[in-house]
Design a protein with these regions (language model features):
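Alpha-helical scaffold segments that form or flank carboxylate-/histidine-based iron centers
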Residues: 45-56, 74-93, 136, 161-173, ...
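Extended, helix-rich structural scaffolds rather than catalytic motifs
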Residues: 196-327
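Internal, conserved structured core segments that host functional sites
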Residues: 126-179
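Conserved alpha-helical segments that form or flank metal/cofactor-binding pockets of metalloenzymes
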Residues: 20-24, 81, 86-114, 180-185
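Acidic/His metal-coordination segments adjacent to aromatic residues that form catalytic metal sites
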Residues: 34-54, 114-140, 157, 190-194, ...
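Glycine- and acidic-residue-rich phosphate-binding/metal-coordinating active-site segment common to enzymes
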Residues: 157-208
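Helix-loop segments that flank and shape redox-cofactor active sites
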Residues: 40-45, 63-85, 147-162
Length: 327
């Protein structure tokens, strides 16, 4: 009887049932019950997740480029093997996340094409060049360190497939962060030229790493709704503060300095206070006018076009396999 009533309400666009569904959804959110693909969800919730998961997936895929650029120039065979494994992990993370996005009813090819067309974004950090080997260590340490702060909270996001993907991704990102810090430690204990190279990399990546958490909460158009639906668990400013508190002691342990003259430790609050982020630079990069924006998208478009035959072959093989099973 209930199923028949639900069907009638759906066919007649019965508003009462819609309210009941929304109330049930909000109740599940309040009770910390994961929302699964087969569950009813508001269209705005679905669209918000597609945007966030899609951008997260794009970031993993585009993030392979600045590091992949150094695979052939790694200083030792050990470093090369580590970097190869890391870039391979990033590709896997992108695939997990595209699969999670597909559970929301979107097509992987569609959201990927939107990224290539500039209609979907990826993390601003990957629009900065990697100029030295120290940059690779600093990306692992600072950039993946910032990602971990963000992503550990996402292990408890309200959408089940996203949360489960994040559990695996966070384990691998922790390895990446430790690998990056170990590479930076080796440079910090090396020659004066190596130490200067490390400090230069920190100087260039410190502020972009802070920008990874997004705009201040007051200026973030999506944060309030994402927090209410528990897609996000913490605001951008709180996560950014956690990263600074975690990372400044690590910088000092390496004998390096944070490129922020306003940085100080506040005894009363127990937090580090840091200077104002250059939000104009953030806006420029996020809107496609960064140092490497054009280069990154050009590389991805080239790979997409040259890889068309692989996708076609895989599809043809899948169709043959399906036909055999049906027969």
């Amino acid at each position: 009887v209930i199923q028949h009533y639900a069907l009638i309400c759906k066919l007649t666009n019965h508003k009462g049932d819609d309210v009941t569904q929304e109330q049930r959804f909000e109740q599940r959110i309040a009770q910390e019950t994961a929302i699964e693909p087969q569950d009813w969800m508001p269209d705005a919730y679905r669209k918000t997740l597609i945007r966030q998961i899609g951008q997260h997936a794009h970031s993993e895929i585009v993030g392979m480029l600045p590091e992949g650029n150094w695979i052939t120039r790694a200083p030792t065979l050990r470093r090369k093997a580590i970097l190869l494994a890391k870039v391979q992990d990033e590709a896997g993370h992108g695939l997990y996340l595209y699969s999670a996005a597909e559970t929301l009813g979107c097509a992987r090819e569609d959201i990927y094409q939107k990224m290539l067309d500039g209609r979907m974004k990826y993390s601003s950090i990957f629009n900065y060049p990697t100029l030295s080997w120290a940059d690779i260590g600093v990306i692992g340490w600072l950039v993946d360190g910032a990602a971990i702060v963000n992503q550990v909270a996402l292990c408890r996001t309200s959408y089940g497939p996203y949360a489960r993907a994040m559990v695996k991704i966070c384990k691998e990102e922790s390895f990446h962060q430790r690998q990056g810090f170990e590479a930076c430690m080796a440079l910090a204990q090396g020659s004066e030229a190596q130490r200067q190279m490390l400090q230069d990399a920190i100087n260039r990546f410190w502020w972009p790493a802070l920008m990874m958490f997004g705009p201040n909460d007051d200026n973030s158009p999506n944060s309030a709704r994402s927090l209410a639906w528990k897609i996000k668990r913490f605001g951008n400013d709180e996560l950014r503060q956690r990263f600074v508190d975690n990372t400044v002691p690590q910088v000092e342990m390496l004998g390096m300095t944070v490129p922020d003259p306003d940085l100080r430790f506040d005894e009363e609050s127990g937090h580090y206070r840091f200077g104002e982020i250059d939000w104009q630079e953030f806006d420029e990069v996020i809107n496609g006018r960064g140092i490497c924006n054009h280069e990154r998208l050009a590389a991805k478009r080239k790979a997409w076009e040259e890889g068309a035959w692989v996708r076609e072959a895989a599809l043809a093989h899948a169709e043959k396999q399906h036909a055999r099973k049906v027969a």
